[in-house]
UniProtKB/Swiss-Prot annotation:
This is Ribosomal RNA small subunit methyltransferase G. It comes from Synechococcus sp. (strain CC9311). One of its GO terms (cellular component) is cytosol. GO terms for molecular function: rRNA (guanine-N7-)-methyltransferase activity. InterPro entries: rRNA_ssu_MeTfrase_G, SAM-dependent_MTases_sf. HAMAP family: 16SrRNA_methyltr_G (MF_00074). Belongs to the methyltransferase superfamily. RNA methyltransferase RsmG family. It is found in: Cytoplasm. Its main location: cytoplasm.
């Protein structure tokens, strides 16, 4: 009888698939994160992905696999922002895996950011994790955030053109935006490329994997700036979602 996999309890199969192995302290932090998520989920509806494979694959693995390159240099100093962090993913998992990285986690729902901030402090990440309660259209126009991040990421937030408008203005020179997606089509790519034109950015890479244990297809889109993003982006709150770039007659404005 074949040996059962260990995807449900952070066993070696999980890390072998990921190509990264947490040290003892990091594994302890990830397990504590699961316990904290259980606690807060009983008070605030953060996520249903808390137990067994749903936590270790759909949360931890899915947060970290797009960072294959960054995981090779975990102590390198970086600034990273997680937009629409929700229950703290991918941001908190990234903070654990990349100890040299400072994280900004943004969400517009105060009860969620309160829970995420409490979890970050309990995990000993408070000095590296800054939690902001605001719309990302506001974040992207603030001097303290705009054009300052090496990595800007968003998982399951909105359509690709909308997410691109959220993330690109946050990027420092040579920074990259990471879009965590599921299925990806030629139409998705065409729409995104059109949206990137007024943002002065380009599609740098597209990578796909199947999550372990049949948990589904995932796509990583990396975007990089080719010139400073025009100050008119992101547009005011709500406009990126109502009038996505790539579908407008005035996309060529700068």
């Amino acid at each position: 009888m074949p040996e059962a996999n260990t995807f449900s309890d952070a066993g070696p199969d999980l890390w072998q698939c990921l190509g990264w192995q947490p040290n003892e302290n990091q594994l302890s932090q990830l397990k504590e994160l699961q316990a904290l998520l259980r606690h807060w989920n009983s008070r605030v509806n953060l996520t249903r992905l808390v137990e067994n494979e749903e936590f270790w694959i759909a949360q931890v693995f899915d947060s970290l696999w797009p960072l294959e390159k960054e995981l090779r240099t975990p102590d390198l100093t970086r600034r990273c922002i997680d937009v629409g962090t929700g229950g703290g993913f991918p941001g908190l998992a990234v903070a654990i895996a990349l100890p040299g990285t400072s994280l900004t986690l943004v969400d517009s729902v105060g009860r969620k950011t309160a829970a995420v901030e409490s979890m970050a402090n309990a995990l000993g990440l408070g000095t590296r994790v800054d939690v902001r309660t605001e719309r990302v259209e506001v974040t992207g126009q603030k001097r303290s955030c705009r054009g300052t991040f090496d990595l800007a990421m968003a998982r399951a937030v909105a359509t690709p053109p909308v997410v691109a408008e959220y993330l690109v203005p946050l990027l420092a020179h040579q920074g990259q935006a990471l879009l965590y997606r599921g299925h990806w089509s030629n139409d998705d790519e065409a729409n995104l490329k059109r949206a990137l034109v007024p943002l002065k950015a380009k599609l740098a890479d597209c990578k796909q994997i199947n999550l372990p244990a049949g948990r589904g297809l995932r796509t990583l889109i990396r975007i990089e700036s080719i010139a400073p993003c025009p100050k008119s982006y992101p547009r005011p709150v709500g406009l990126p979602n109502r009038l996505p770039l790539g579908n407008q007659a005035d996309d060529k404005r700068s």
